[in-house]
């Protein structure tokens, strides 16, 4: 087995002033020993309890995310596991930290009219630390569920790094490179990737393994997602595709 993945990373050149060079690609190498796949907020698209609410908010974005999980993210995770890359799930939660007294809770209540403590309660947590209940959103199905050897980190804001154990886990694993997938691109995945860069992790996002929250009457379908992909390529890291990643995993594992 080869010990290194090689992927073409796309980025955007915002120079020279007044005449940007635009998109470019370069070969990026990822040692298996210091690379992990980061999976942000993917839940079971077919889990019965997930049909009442989706973190993707709009019907269009929810529909697109379900297709992406089934057709693109699952093969990516299967490929990563097959060559021994750590797979790290980052998921919403409701810790007992008086979130209702926070500006974050107020903003979510005003924009989505949801009680985060109730929305993200779980029935398999310590009720002394987390809000215990039967969440109607944090459910997995056979396609999306973490495997026994995967890692699982709970978060309670958009960023998977804020007040969590994620950075500790990555440093203990010796990770320097993150292959990122999940949702929503303009919220939790985006915030997590920004915080990863600030902590000196190199970020590669699989651009067909994510989607943004697109608003009816404001965003033509796909436009806000496309703009955010370009933003990632301008200011956060690089992008590639699920097919390229899966093919490279197959090559490395052969």
Language-model features, listed with the residues they occupy:
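Active-site-adjacent betaalpha module
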Residues: 1-36, 43-54, 63-66, 75, ...
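Active-/binding-site microenvironments in catalytic and ligand-binding cores
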Residues: 70
